């Protein structure tokens, strides 16, 4: 899934003029990135397992029991706020002005909610923390790094986050749409 999300983000970047595809030259490093992009999330999953155990396995279903959409928004918002210190300590969103850091913090909220919809769907379908951990690793190490690599190696973190949000919107729309159709079918069968 992360490779597909990266492709959507790159398409959005190209369509909006954020990425001039004609000026881009595919080199050996790009080939290596593409070759390992599907393996990296799996290899990195143990690094993200602890975070997903806490957010997904422990917090998610306890936060707003029986209300998956409400718990998704609540967990996503808490998760986004949890990451707010990162631009101030040299991680994602660092290197710019204080305004850039604040904007990065605010943009993490919609990104975290969108990711939480996908994570919640994976968790609900699998009952395991591993698929969310794989997605989390892929989102950080394939989607974010890939956007930075292909769109503009010096791309501002907020550009990367905006493109990630744009790429996750259709994924979330498909998940929500499929859930609505499934629920309606279930109701129709029960009647």
Regions found by a protein language model. Give the residues of each.
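Interfacial transmembrane-helix boundary/kink motif in multi-pass membrane proteins
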Residues: 1-11, 15, 22-35, 60-74
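C-terminal membrane module of polytopic membrane proteins
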Residues: 103, 135-191
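Membrane-interface interhelical connector segments
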Residues: 59, 87-100
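Juxtamembrane helix-entry segments on the extracytoplasmic side of multipass membrane proteins
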Residues: 24-40, 94-110, 158, 163
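Hydrophobic/aromatic residues in alpha-helical transmembrane segments
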Residues: 8, 59, 115-119
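Membrane-interface helix/loop boundary segments of multi-pass membrane proteins
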Residues: 50-81, 120, 124-128
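Residue-level signature of the transmembrane alpha-helical core
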Residues: 3, 38, 42-46, 73-80, ...
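Aromatic-anchored segments of alpha-helical transmembrane domains
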Residues: 3-11, 77-86, 137-147
